């Protein structure tokens, strides 16, 4: 069964929640699944979201033989529409779902529910859980574990998916439920009412050490930042200052962490001057590395926190040919009342709107930058 429980949550628009800090009710499934079992199989679907074939959504919803007859929705219009709209999200590509939106998780569960069904039809006694693309099955014997790998490989192949062989393993029980580094960091979490400088230094040192041990797995640093971010109200001044300084240093070193900068660092009481000083440093590195996503975040941070960016920003954004970078650069210039920057990006958006393929690849930027009378049809009505 899936550990992604799609449901309406109170007080949020989210349809499920991923939280590594608080055990979910799903953890109670483990003892029942382990009873009488001697081996654990761990499997990971290879390049899961990028590999999802949008037509496979139609296959999963109405069966493959029916889906092949479902051109233009002749048999089932809504399943055909899900396939078609999924393609429109990726510039009409039939392979790949967007990574991040909860809608992608909902769509992927349509396929995985069929995979789960196929596994149970092969062996009704299989006891397995999956968390998005990570499967764990508990078996009585090594041979049964091997059969599970063969069965899930076959079930995935029916939807043009495959296992990542490097991440497929069979382990003898007992084994821990938490990843080793998670367990170690949970034990090291500062417990005192007042968090002192040495507590924060020690916790970061341990997290960085584990990261280096495990091939620069930045998820470890992110976990540590989330733990410490919740404790900033209990930190003495020097401890809090160290947390902000070390966190911005780690953000600079690991672009993977940038999407979490605001929630885990900036909004935890960081000095505004320190935030605005950090932004151009972050931007300069991102430009040098051609990291357009971090450039986009830099523009967002600069606009929101009234920071500054180099005078080359407009040329950088236009040269990048990146939708999000240009969008947030445009927003930055609007916030700063920079008529020159706004005009240059407006002209670029207008030029992109003249070609259907260019428009599809940059629709979000074009839609935001152009005036209502510059748009046609449904886009004009929507604006």
Task: Tell me the role of every PLM-derived stretch.
Residues 3-18, 83-88, 141-149, 181-186, ...:
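Short, charged low-complexity intrinsically disordered segments located at boundaries
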Residues 142-198, 202:
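Polymerase palm active-site segment centered on the conserved acidic dipeptide of motif C
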Residues 31-132, 138-146, 194-383:
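Conserved polymerase palm-domain catalytic core
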Residues 1-40:
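Active-site-proximal segment of RNA-dependent polymerases
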